[in-house]
């Protein structure tokens, strides 16, 4: 009996700790993404180390925006702020004019599809890898997402279609095929915003270029933000911003100038990279 009572109180303590550490829901307003995302002089840092310094950025809905810059410049931090995983230390982020902190954060995140750098696939079917077992998603939803990701053609050619087993870590598929399935996973919930965080870095140039063309075709129905050092994702973007020393600088003119100047491109008197 004493052992059972001890286990009971240990469980109660664990539940209380989990409830205390639970993330608050944020604001009460229902989010939508119909107009634009705006960063207004947003700053963030870790301790005394500043990461973002009074960043201003406007992303119109339905456009493709690329963020470039050296490792550690704060590109992922900027995405974490947008996903409400972090909170600005000063400044604000507005979604259609509404401060992000006033929105229900869980509903806001449901509007976001996120594709990370590392491709993680289960040793299971293509269907399971797209839906991740979500009972709200059907085979029709998976097919739609795979079509959007440019993957349906190769899925149809497999012997078992959606029920095809991809192998350990997707080993039965090519790198491009694996990446398209991960993108389809992000698209399955019909996001309004798709974030690509170095999502094509492991692909060969031909596969990367094909996927970038597919991602561009998602606009204007979906807003796309891509973090990348690679030319293919930059060349298809409507706007390109370089994050350097905590500040955002817009690259104007021919995109080749980014590769001509590199990550330490000079800044003109207007705060933009000089045009060719």
For each feature predicted by the language model, list its residue ranges.
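ABC-type nucleotide-binding domain
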Residues: 30-276
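Pre-NBD coupling/linker segments of ABC/ABC-like ATPases
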Residues: 20-32
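Cytosolic ends of transmembrane helices, especially the final helix of ABC transmembrane type-1 domains
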Residues: 1-14, 125
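An intracellular "coupling" helix at the cytosolic face of ABC transporter transmembrane type-1 domains
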Residues: 3, 13, 17-20, 43, ...
């Amino acid at each position: 009996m004493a052992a059972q009572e001890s286990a009971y109180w240990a469980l109660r303590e664990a539940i209380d700790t989990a409830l205390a550490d639970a993330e608050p829901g944020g604001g009460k307003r229902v989010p939508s993404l119909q107009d634009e995302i705006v960063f207004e002089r947003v700053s963030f840092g870790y301790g005394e180390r500043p990461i973002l310094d009074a960043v201003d950025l406007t992303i119109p809905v339905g456009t493709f925006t690329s963020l470039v810059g050296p490792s550690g410049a704060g590109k992922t931090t900027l995405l974490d702020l947008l996903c409400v995983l972090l909170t600005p230390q000063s400044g604000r982020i507005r979604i259609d004019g509404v401060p992000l902190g006033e929105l229900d954060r869980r509903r806001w995140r449901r509007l976001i599809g996120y594709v990370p750098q590392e491709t993680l696939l289960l040793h299971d079917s293509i269907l399971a890898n797209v839906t991740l077992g979500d009972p709200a998603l059907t085979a029709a939803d998976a097919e739609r997402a795979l079509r959007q990701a440019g993957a349906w053609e190769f899925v149809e050619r497999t012997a078992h279609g959606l029920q095809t087993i991809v192998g350990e870590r997707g080993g039965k598929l090519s790198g491009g095929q694996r990446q398209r399935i991960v993108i389809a996973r992000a698209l399955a919930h019909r996001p309004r915003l798709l974030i690509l965080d170095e999502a094509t870095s492991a692909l060969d140039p031909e596969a990367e270029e094909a996927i970038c063309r597919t991602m561009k075709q998602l606009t204007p129905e979906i807003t796309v933000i891509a973090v990348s050092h690679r030319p293919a994702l930059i060349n298809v973007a409507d706007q390109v911003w370089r994050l350097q020393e905590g500040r955002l600088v817009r690259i104007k003119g021919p995109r080749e100038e980014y590769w001509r100047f590199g990550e330490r491109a000079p800044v003109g008197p207007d705060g933009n990279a000089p045009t060719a």
